[in-house]
Amino acid sequence: MRFTAPLILPAIFLAITAIVLEAQGPAGAASPDADSAAWSGTKWPEKDLGAPLLRDPIFVYNDWSAYDELSDNIPLTEQLAMKELDEILRLRKSGVRFDYYMMDAFWFDPDGGYRTWRKPNWPNGPNAWIKKCRDNGILPGLWFSTNTLVKINAAPEWQNSLTEKKGSMSFFEGGFLSNFMDSLQYWYDHGIRMFKFDFVDFNAATPETQRTKSQEEIQIRNADAFREALRKFRQRNPDIVLVAFNGFGGDVESTSGPFPFHNKVDLRWLEVFDSLYSGDPRASDVPEMNFWRSMDIYSDHMVRRYEQSFLPLERIDSTGFMLGNTGTIYYRKTNAWKGALILMMARGGWVNTVHGNLEYLTDEDARWFAKVQSLYLRLESMGRTKTFGGIPGDVEPYGFGSMDPEGTVYAVVNPAQVVQEIRMPLLSKEQGPLGAGRLLFEDAGFKPVLSGDRVKLGPGQMALVGFGKYARSTYDLGVQEDVRIPGSIRPVDASFVGHGKNTIEATVIMPKHGDLRLVMRQRSSDGNIMRSWKGGPPNGTNMGNFFQLRAWQDGKPVPVEIHYDKVIWSGLSWAVGEIKHDAVTAGQPVTVQCSSGENDAVDLEGKTYEVEY
């Protein structure tokens, strides 16, 4: 029911108006106290704006992927951590902003109950690192595996909270939670201001409780106990940042799983966490010739799914930007890093996490990095970000639009094996016409075609488009030369048939001018997209050997160029390769074959395309 207060309660309204005007002072007069709330005259410190959660976007450096002790054997050491801190300070000179340094997994002594640091990796403990961070205006953070025993042993105080298998602890039984929160407070008192919680287990219960309580009741009691403990921790330490990772809801293994999530996201976690993450970087189930673009699509897809689960974009940490030469990031180094950075910012999260080896970025790279930050930090802080288009994992064109009163920036992606046009809609009814736009960034190869509020993209291409103030050349970000998109693509008829176990084969006519692109997708016998997990480094299987694409002409093998030939800890459901036109005779038959190394029977789907670069 809508009503107008002056008409319903004129006397009360006039009285309230008089009180408000008295509190504000004479018309046009400045407030006598800049920290006072104008409507009440009550003193309200500026630092409390938005409390107890983040008031503005932040940038976090995380050293995971510079080292990797899970899918690789590169350890975290004090030397590595201090080196990356020096790199932060170097990048700052070029304008890059970092607010926090998150020390990720396994800094702790396995027998120290999160109170002591691992030796010999940290012979003198963390004091030098903490001091150097704080001396340079960077707030340090620490990673915890919450209530699971990941490379840590149960402290004496945790023993009466252990599960029967002794792999995790109950939050609502025994001494674990109290001791754990004391450890967090200990580190706060020693200068830590950001806390990352990973690998949580809400199914944990002591053997007696496991026998007498339902699993649902155990989950509820664990979540309630931990959430209340974090709430009290926040009240005591209002300047902390808390971030949630694995176990706090959502299904992050693939982009082809059912939705809504089987593991629902409890929105009450937003009462205590500044952000929830949406999955570590991995390939999506969308095949792409450029492996890194498929990873972009994964992060884009998961952010959309978490948004559809009613999380505000500001509270989702896509964790989509990692540099490094470790197994966790598939030895990416800096491949296609510019597009990954733009998309991380474009997704609208307020916790923007940069992982890995900062030394891989040159000073010139740093200046470009700072330019992207400057663009998006203003849009995130002063404006809004909204999603539009289709669902990334459904292979539909999509994007993220960010606006402020002066203009709009659209990050757009075409995940399909076809040239497609996408409309960039107005993001608000209050928004005026877009006017003339400008391409600010694009992948190499196919030249995006901008026409009014529409842009045409090549297969697997991303671009950035600015309108209003952001259509000026000063916002140009250039071309991503290490992602090359075909100038044209068209399907080539191919009838694939079975050719032995988990193998399909077809004979096609090699295009007269372009290359032949071969795309394979793997499904289980029930028709669902199926990932194969063959382990991480150093002992995992290279997926280029597991998913094999072969070709012959006149009985002789011809090379097939692939980019998925990596040891992929997170699994893969597809393969894409190209036969270059100068490696075969154009216009003549070529036999192509796709195979999977799965032991059980799978269904393989093959398609071929002519692509010209």
Identify the role of each PLM range.
Residues 97-319:
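Aromatic- and carboxylate-enriched substrate-binding clefts and catalytic-loop regions
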Residues 25-151, 328, 350-393, 402-408, ...:
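Conserved structural scaffold segments of CAZyme catalytic domains across common CAZy folds
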Residues 76-93, 174-188, 337-338:
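Short, acidic/polar
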Residues 30, 62, 226-448, 452-465:
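Active-site-proximal substrate-binding groove within the catalytic cores of carbohydrate-active enzymes
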Residues 1-9:
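Bacterial N-terminal signal peptides that target proteins for export
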Residues 8-22:
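Bacterial N-terminal signal peptides
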Residues 1, 19-29:
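Basic/polar N-terminal segments that are highly enriched at the extreme N-terminus
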Residues 385-396, 405-407, 412-613:
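C-terminal beta-sandwich/jelly-roll accessory domains of carbohydrate-active enzymes
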